């Protein structure tokens, strides 16, 4: 298997699919940074902003106006670590951090887009938006069947201008049609929701340099996220319970997204909670029901003093 996947709960999407020797397909930014040195500059978020004429500069350069958005120039762990809005010069002076930068505070829809790229030309798109909750957490992601022609045109032009010669998958995060982050990989949280044969098409893109995927049966999907309070050491639910839930109509897959033998602090998590599970589905009602049952199962696996998980939203 040449698909580099660090999270064991996501290997289910790639196991058993043949992949030629010598082909490296990243799902982790650290791998992509190593494997694609010519294009690794895109992990510099300050460079991404400047490539589009977005007002931005390293900490130490005072913004001409507030509020601004501040974050690390480079963060390969994700989860929005170190990101925040800075509202005033006084707050900015107190928040100065080496390796961070500020950028103008963008407005508009926040979209995550997976793109297949052939030699610097975007040839396939799929878009998703998150339903946020406090503290950088999410209730769910909606993976849309519909295209976004205006966004695709703008991002396609940027890709052609800045990634000549690149062949592979990309993930772009945009706000109001402007790119805030770019990744040399796809979103490995929901590849099953893209349809049968999609992973094989990705392998073909890296192996042969050609994207070949009919994509004739698109349907909107949902990636339901289960968060709980940070701090406790959670345990996995029983395998039999998981197997039964995976068989429910409308459910595509279930991920238990933590290592129960790790100290909780080793996991990269947003400030608002600890992510326990993800339910991918095409039926929103079924996904909500299975997520609720997962919450109960995870609570039953815990010690009595933290059974409050049963009441978590």
PLM segments and residue spans:
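ATP-dependent carboxylate/phosphate-activation module, predominantly the ATP-grasp catalytic core
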Residues: 107-110, 115-164, 176-225
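Short secondary-structure junctions
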Residues: 55-56, 97, 163-166, 246-254
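A short glycine-rich, hydrophobically flanked beta-strand micro-motif that places a catalytic Asp/Glu
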Residues: 164-177, 257-258
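Peripheral (often C-terminal) accessory segments that flank ATP-dependent C-N-forming ligase machineries
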Residues: 52, 204-313
């Amino acid at each position: 298997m040449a698909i580099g996947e660090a999270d064991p709960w996501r290997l289910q999407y790639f196991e058993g699919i043949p992949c030629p020797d010598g082909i490296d397909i990243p799902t982790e930014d650290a791998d992509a940074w190593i494997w694609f040195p010519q294009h690794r500059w895109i992990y510099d978020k300050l460079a991404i902003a400047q490539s589009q004429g977005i007002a931005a500069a390293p900490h130490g350069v005072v913004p001409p106006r507030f509020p601004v958005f501040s974050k690390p120039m480079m963060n390969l762990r994700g989860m929005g670590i170190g990101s925040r809005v800075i509202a005033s010069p006084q707050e900015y002076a107190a928040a100065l951090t080496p390796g961070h930068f500020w950028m103008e505070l963008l407005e508009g829809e926040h979209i995550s887009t997976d793109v297949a790229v052939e030699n610097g030309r975007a040839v396939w798109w799929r878009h998703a938006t998150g339903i946020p909750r406090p503290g950088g957490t999410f209730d769910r992601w909606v993976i849309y069947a519909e295209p976004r022609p205006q966004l695709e045109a703008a991002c396609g032009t940027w890709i052609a201008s800045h990634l000549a010669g690149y062949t592979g998958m990309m993930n772009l995060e945009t706000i109001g049609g402007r790119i805030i982050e770019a990744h040399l990989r796809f979103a490995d949280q929901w590849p099953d929701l893209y349809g049968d044969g999609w992973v094989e098409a990705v392998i073909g893109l890296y192996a042969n340099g050609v994207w070949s995927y009919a994509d004739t049966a698109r349907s909107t999907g949902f990636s339901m996220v289960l968060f709980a309070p940070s701090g406790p050491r959670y345990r996995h639910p029983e395998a039999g319970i998981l197997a039964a839930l995976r068989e429910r109509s409308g459910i595509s897959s279930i991920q238990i997204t933590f290592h129960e033998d790790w100290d909780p602090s080793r996991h990269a998590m947003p400030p608002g909670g600890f992510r326990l599970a993800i339910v991918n589905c095409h039926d929103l009602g079924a996904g909500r029901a299975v997520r609720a049952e997962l919450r109960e199962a995870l609570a039953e696996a815990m010690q009595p003093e933290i059974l409050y998980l049963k009441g978590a939203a």
